[in-house]
């Protein structure tokens, strides 16, 4: 069945060209007193991108008319077209995602990026060299995250004429980013960053299955096929719950086709939901017994524990995220197991990879790029379209309440550490946990019975809708 969260979103999402990505973007937000801007001139040169400009997506023209303008007039016309296109795209993005906020919203608060803390300080006593080192490390880390965007020019989907996912594929692309990041963590570790020289084979092997064709294991084509029973279809937007289930189905299919030692996705996929198939209200429950079962199924009974990715689809309110959940959302990025959040504005999904205070830093899939074929046999392939240098942020309170958390646990010790952190987070949530943790289904049933006459439980669940 479809999640309740999916009813909040329209059927299409929006697109933009790459020109927005290639604008200069200061690390510090433009808002704030002017003396702060002059004081921290170092920050203005970080997170800038190349100066190339690309046009917004459109079908190629079949016209064969020759150019008749002079070089000067041709350049003038080109500048006018770029200016008009950039302005239209900027206004369009502001309507969908809100004002284009770039850089760092604060010069003093720590930044958390998928479990790693960057201590940003603007104190008089802090040296500029130290600040510059931190900013450079943050820039390198962010720009090393995998970006998946709209693509054009791939083979049509089955029984359709779609050769691009423009205007509807953003949630699928966001989910591809999350899984690609989990694979990078698995193969190369959290400390890995993109090198300027030829890429590592493990890096290329990570990108290869996300190609835009059916032979690619995690392509948009195969996700749509795997998620058909959850409403995935070419041309239609999809919500967080449905895409999580699509990944679960795709992982199960690939597991059955391949032996455990040669899995394209070398980890179990486990979705955290409510007890008794969601019949009880309240926060979703991570049952350790069920997670262990997922690992056993993935290894086909050969191992009691394997790497695992946990997906937690949530609905944190009605029209917007209830503010009482925001501190917990922020805290999840301090977990070393965090692989981010699938979320954004209604009908416009993004991949949130970090936070500063109550702002979320995200990678935006709403850019249209040509299909690129990446594999380990072509180490010199240009993979720049899979990365972004522009740090964008969105207030967490403005997110659509339908979202999904992601966590990757490398082994049993890592999973145990995650459970301890999750339990502590639930205890400190003031009665509004994102999700809870229990050992067995017996404990869940006892909890259900114990809460039967508890008025505070009803109050705690007012904003919850189970998936």
Curated annotation (Swiss-Prot):
It catalyses: [protein]-C-terminal L-amino acid-glycyl-phosphatidylethanolamide + H2O = [protein]-C-terminal L-amino acid-glycine + a 1,2-diacyl-sn-glycero-3-phosphoethanolamine. The gene is ATG4A. Belongs to the peptidase C54 family. Its EC number is 3.4.22.-. The keyword Hydrolase applies. Disulfide bonds: none annotated. Pfam families: Peptidase_C54. It comes from Arabidopsis thaliana. GO terms for biological process: autophagy; protein transport; proteolysis. It is found in: Cytoplasm. Residues 1-35, 448-467 are annotated as: Disordered. Keywords: Autophagy, Cytoplasm, Hydrolase, Protease, Protein transport, Thiol protease, Transport, Ubl conjugation pathway. This is Cysteine protease ATG4a.
